[in-house]
Amino acid sequence: SYYNDSSNPCFAGWSTSEVLGGGIVRVDQLVSGDIVRTRDGYSSIICVVKTYCKDGRTDIVTLDSGLAITPFHPIFYKGRWEYPKNIGEVSNIECKAVYSFVLEKDHMMLINGTPCICFGHGFDEGILQHHYYGTHRIIDDLKTMPGWNIGLIELQSGCIKVDEYGIVIGLVYNT
């Protein structure tokens, strides 16, 4: 499954989200406690996971909406869950860091108006199914890392642990 790709499953910082009250905020400006628009309403951000990109570059798909997302991060597009790489062109671009989120509920955050799945979502349908990103295992790992208690974990590239088949099995805090 492509969802097992070891590249960062995240959003570029210049993508945007709507916060409660109707304001539009860049993803790299969101903090724990912000209440963001989800597919089904609003949810509070529990934790922001900021991952620095190797050599300041990463593969990104930029959609017409302005959503800049890694190629294998599931999004809800035209009535179904899809990988961005199947919708737009993958480009290796300058990007200092990418961002992921742990939400309190409704684990489908709207980024540039597109529902995007978040860590620990618990869904097991189609491409959303993931034995790590989609389960509480990732949340358990994040809870052990410096920054969880303040809602901001900063990771370096290479933080994703894979098995001998290249399947994502964990995150490692690497300073």
Feature-to-residue mapping (PLM):
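HINT/intein-family self-processing domains that catalyze protein splicing or autoproteolytic maturation
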Residues: S1-T175
